C-alpha cells in the first residue's frame, strides 16, 4: 500500500494551505543585526526623517536606525517597559506600555528622548499594547487585558487634546496590533488570544459605522 506523498510544500510542521500557495510572495532578507543577544523587538515605525524606530520589549529601550544603518538608543532608561510606538505629527514619539501587566501607560518623548510626558496614566487601568495616530492628531490604542475566556481588552481612542478616552471596540481577548487606513475611515486590530483580525469601518473618529 502506498503511503501519503509529501513534498516541500506539505512536509512542514505548518504547511501553506492549498488556497494560498499560488499567492505572490517575497522572501524577507536580513537587514540589520541589532544585537547578538536574543531580544524581542517590536513597535517598528518611521519618524519624519525616515529613521526606523523600534523598542526592546524586555528593557523598554527605544532604538533608532538611520537610513545609513547607524544604530543609536533614543531612550535608555524606561522602567515602564515598551511594546509599541507611534510618531505624532509634531515629531514626538509616543510609547505604548503594558507595564507590569497590571498598569500600562502611554508616554510621549521628544525625538531626542527628553521631556517625557504622561499621556495615558497607569491608574486608568489599561494594558496599552500598540497605538496608531489618525490625521487629526488623536490616536487609537489596543488594550491587552483579559484572556480567551475573559475578554476585557479592546480598542480605544484618545482625542487630539488628550481630554477623553472613547471605547471603540470593547470586549477583545488581549488586543494587540493596530493599523489605520490613510484617510482614517477603517482600523484593523488583532485579538491575540482568539487569533482574530478585526476590520472596523468608522463614521467618524469615535463612531463605528452601521454594519462596520
Predicted regions and their residues:
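A short loop-to-beta-strand structural motif that recurs across blades of beta-propeller domains
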Residues: 61-63, 104-107, 153-156, 196-198
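A short helix->beta-strand "capping" segment at the edge of beta-propeller domains
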Residues: 11-38, 67-69
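A short, charged helix-loop
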Residues: 153-167
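A short beta-strand motif characteristic of beta-propeller blades
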Residues: 27-34, 69-76, 114-122, 163-170, ...
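Beta-propeller domains
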Residues: 49-77
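Beta-rich, blade/repeat-based domains predominating
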Residues: 34-49, 77-105, 122-141, 146-147, ...
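Anionic-ligand binding region
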Residues: 193-212
